[in-house]
Amino acid sequence: ASWRILNSLTAGDPRFELIRLASNQGQAYARNVALKQAAGEFVAFLDSDDSLSDDALESAVSVFRAHGKTDAVLFRLVKFEDTPAGRVEAAYPMSVFEALDGREAFKKSLDWQLHGIYVARRSLYERFPFDDSCRTYSDDNTTRLHYYASREVRCCNGIYFYRQHGSSVTHRVSVRRFDYLRACESMK
């Protein structure tokens, strides 16, 4: 059903190229396949159950245009959950900042004082593609490398709405939790 919906939404619009993989090989693998098709100056990822505010991309690009040394721009992050009582939203507890150098952004990302939802220059993704050593958690490594290699990291006012749900691979208890350790080990 999702494939059919995507085809109907993007039909006739040359800005979109749909890619369908034969099997699920994890988020990092899929994103690396998509990056090979990316032609723009900036890259952002949006997971299938998440959404962006109407102005999110425009807001991020305006920060890049105003600050030529900026290599990564963080969205405001709002987590949400659909409950029987309605939609519950909570802003991610991150201090807003004007600009950080890459090393400082990297340090703040280690304990997620800085979240990992951002737009980056395509050149960062080309230099540091997604670590596909694990099916989960390895995108954390890529985020940290992008921050570390950035001349400047800034925030924008665009909002990324992140769907929080207990059945998510990274939130439920399973042996997949050990992928976190494997992902950390691959950072060496």
Predicted regions and their residues:
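Nucleotide-sugar donor-binding/catalytic module of glycosyltransferases
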Residues: A1-E185
